């Protein structure tokens, strides 16, 4: 059995824990969790214990890594990803990241790539809302590649961001046009998927992103266009 741990114990971590409980990950044991909010970590531990599975809440990242996990699921934040990736990889632990926006930083991306290679570990990028990364990689390998990412959101999904104003409730508008690297800086929790698609193809600086706000729209529409 492979040992699995989680950093960040919110909704996404709960989905992973549920998958373990339901037997959807038969080759993995969830052995530990870590969250800066202790009550959230305790909630997941309690869920696992209710189903007869041993799991502990760790007080620090160091305590979590001392469990010698094979895989660490990062479901916390880009800042957490930047903090944990290198220690985990050096520990012999591969990282499955949901905060893909952290990898838009080219220096950090190169550092984690080199550290993973040096330690026989890997960084796994969760595809999230968009699939087809194998197609993007294949097209990119052919050379002379250009790629665009289109995202449609409802105005309520943009509240709290620099582009939001009340006129978006009644007016359809393109609220952002630029690179994936620029997009993740402006929307650090909204467009992780653009960085994921760019890392599978042309890179964050070269992936062009357009975000449209549509009144009354709920959810997200994603479209990736790639040409070579």
Regions found by a protein language model. Give the residues of each.
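Short active-site oxyanion
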Residues: 29-32, 70, 121-123
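Short, ordered loop/turn segments at secondary-structure junctions
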Residues: 36-38, 100-103, 129
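General beta-strand structural signal in soluble alpha/beta enzymes
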Residues: 74, 97, 123-127
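Active-site-lining helix/loop region of Rossmann-like oxidoreductase modules
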Residues: 7, 15, 124, 129-228
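Rossmann-fold NAD(P)-binding glycine/threonine-rich loop
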Residues: 86, 100-121
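A short helix->loop->beta-strand "cap" motif at the edges of active sites that frequently abuts
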Residues: 53-55, 91-94, 118-121
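Beta-loop-alpha module in the N-terminal Rossmann-like domain of NAD(P)-dependent dehydrogenases
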Residues: 59-90, 102-105
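N-terminal Rossmann-like dinucleotide-binding module
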Residues: 1-49
């Amino acid at each position: 059995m492979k040992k699995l741990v989680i950093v960040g114990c919110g909704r996404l971590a709960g989905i992973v824990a549920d998958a373990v409980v339901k037997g959807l990950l038969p080759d993995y044991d969830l052995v530990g969790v870590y969250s800066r909010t202790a009550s959230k970590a305790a909630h997941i531990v309690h869920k696992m214990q209710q189903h007869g599975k041993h799991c502990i809440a760790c007080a620090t990242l160091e305590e979590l890594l001392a469990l010698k996990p094979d895989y660490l699921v990062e479901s916390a934040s880009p800042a957490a990803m930047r903090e944990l990736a290198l220690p985990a990889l050096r520990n012999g632990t591969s990282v499955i990241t949901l905060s893909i926006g952290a990898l838009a930083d080219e220096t950090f991306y190169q550092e984690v790539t080199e550290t993973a290679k040096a330690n026989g570990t890997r960084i796994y990028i969760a595809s999230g809302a968009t699939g087809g990364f194998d197609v993007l990689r294949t097209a990119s390998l052919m050379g002379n590649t250009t790629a665009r990412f289109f995202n449609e959101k409802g105005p309520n999904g943009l509240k709290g961001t620099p582009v939001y104003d009340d006129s978006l409730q009644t007016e359809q508008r393109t609220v952002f046009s630029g690179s994936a690297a620029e997009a993740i800086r402006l929307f650090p929790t909204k467009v992780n998927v653009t960085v994921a698609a760019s890392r599978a193809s042309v890179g964050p600086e070269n992936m062009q992103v357009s975000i449209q706000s549509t009144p009354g729209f709920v959810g997200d529409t994603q479209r990736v266009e790639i040409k070579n």
